[in-house]
Amino acid sequence: MAREEVISIPEIAAILNNYRIGKKPLAKLLGWGETTIIRYMDGDVPTKEYSDKLKMLLNSPLYYYELLLNYKDNLTDVAFKKSKKAVLGKMTESRIRMTAQFFINYYHEEITALQIQTLLYFSQGFSLGFYDTALFEEEYRITTNNCPYIALFDELSCAPLRYFELDEKIFTEKEEKLLTEIAETFSWYGTKAIQKLAEKERSTLKISRDKENNKVVTENSIRTHFKKLMEQDGIKELSDIEGYIEKAVLELKHEKA
């Protein structure tokens, strides 16, 4: 395995720091020999399997959280609680991750990573439309699997979606009301209807290129799009969102017929 493909020593150190866990406890959590992480930090090269596992931990706090819950008996109670606090803190650093978590909690984990993508889009759009404020900073990307927030999708797809209590200060009162309205509205529709609606929305958006030449829909384009549709459909209150989505889904059914 080429050295450049292997997780680096600084990256392993970041895992230990991010999740407040020692070298031996991390090895125990992973079910490895207790000196494994120590050896890697001293310069031993991990196998591809072990390196990939560590990269998953580095890139996905959710994946680490799942591992921690499943194998907490491998740690002392003190080590478990310290690491749990750290990983939950890491997850709350991301606004888009916390917006997704709001929906996971609302649906009591009965939602998929793919469905969350559409709810994030409409939440962002109506936040820009009503309040001129973005809920999160991630840009909408055009992807082949219709996942505009692909990094989050990849993270949510690598482990079961779990409920955990959110700090009440994460969202403002108006943001929480908007997210609740979106959650309640989409609770009436299945995956197929939600995906078809997402596909139709994507076809109406103005696409541009970012610095890396990725196809994206800018925040300003989403704002313009939603303000226009809100004016056209007379959406003046949060409660009007339900009627708009219902109308859009019915139009899709008629188009299919």
Locate each region found by the language model.
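Domain-edge interaction signal
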Residues: 3, 11, 35, 39-257
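Short alpha-helical "recognition helix" segments of helix-turn-helix
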Residues: 15, 21-30, 37
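A short, Lys/Arg-rich alpha-helix, primarily the initiator
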Residues: 1-18
